[in-house]
């Protein structure tokens, strides 16, 4: 899996803007989704922030599947990880 271009990392943030991590590839994004505060995961999932970045790194199918997810506070982490690992 390829790294994104320098400066194009996915910046994982809390809703108040605090940065909680950065990912330069899908594996790092997956690790952030696993370990980041749920509030940050929901912020990005509800804001549909994952799909554009996935498209940029060439993961078109994953981007499409993530955009189609119904965001549920209790299952969002598992649903996102399932898409990224399929």
Feature-to-residue mapping (PLM):
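Terminal, compositionally biased segments used for targeting/anchoring and flexible tails
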Residues: 1-86
């Amino acid at each position: 899996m390829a790294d994104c271009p320098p400066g194009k990392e996915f910046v994982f943030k809390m809703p108040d803007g605090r940065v909680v991590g950065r990912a330069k590839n899908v594996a790092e994004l997956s690790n952030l989704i696993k370990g980041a505060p749920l509030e940050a995961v929901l912020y990005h999932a509800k804001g549909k922030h994952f799909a554009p970045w996935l498209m940029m790194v060439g993961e078109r199918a994953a981007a499409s599947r993530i955009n189609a997810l119904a965001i549920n506070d209790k299952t969002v982490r598992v649903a996102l990880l399932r898409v990224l690992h399929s």
